[in-house]
Amino acid sequence: MSKESSFDIVSKVDLSEVTNAINIALKEIKNRYDFKGSKSDISLDKDELVLISDDEFKLEQLKDVLIGKLIRRGVPTKNIQYGKIEPAAGGTVRQRAKLVQGIDKENAKKINTIIKNTGLKVKSQVQDDQIRVSGKSKDDLQKVIAAIREADLPIDVQFVNYR
């Protein structure tokens, strides 16, 4: 009598770590010489980042500082989708960036295709914004995890509830 093992594939961003990274980035910007007198700011509204700066060059520098801090805090930067740069009030420019939470249908199909192409005896089911993979052999499940990690997906995925 063999019991089935399973794990879930999710794509989540820890918002508390994002908030910490924003605070550290703002502290660095306040102390940097090239940002003296600048109206640069980063804010977080639910699952959207808003970057504001004097011009596009400073906005790119602001984005580089933020990405560095996010990486240091362990936040996946693949899950950030940047919008276009738009003019804002007071001669500044703004850019919105959406934090992607969960796996959408398109990426779920890609992941399911990767799982099917392994040829292993595992089943995968899409459950809302996550995918559950189950099979009798834990070795097969680990091979599926390795195959998904090797694939170049547009989002960062985590593996949880390994049973």
Swiss-Prot record:
Pfam families: DUF520. GO terms for molecular function: nucleotide binding. The keyword Nucleotide-binding applies. SUPFAM superfamilies: YajQ-like. InterPro entries: DUF520, UPF0234-like_C, UPF0234_N, YajQ-like_sf. One of its GO terms (cellular component) is cytosol. It comes from Geobacillus sp. (strain WCH70). Keywords: Nucleotide-binding. It comes from the Bacteria. Belongs to the YajQ family. This is Nucleotide-binding protein GWCH70_0711. Nucleotide-binding protein.
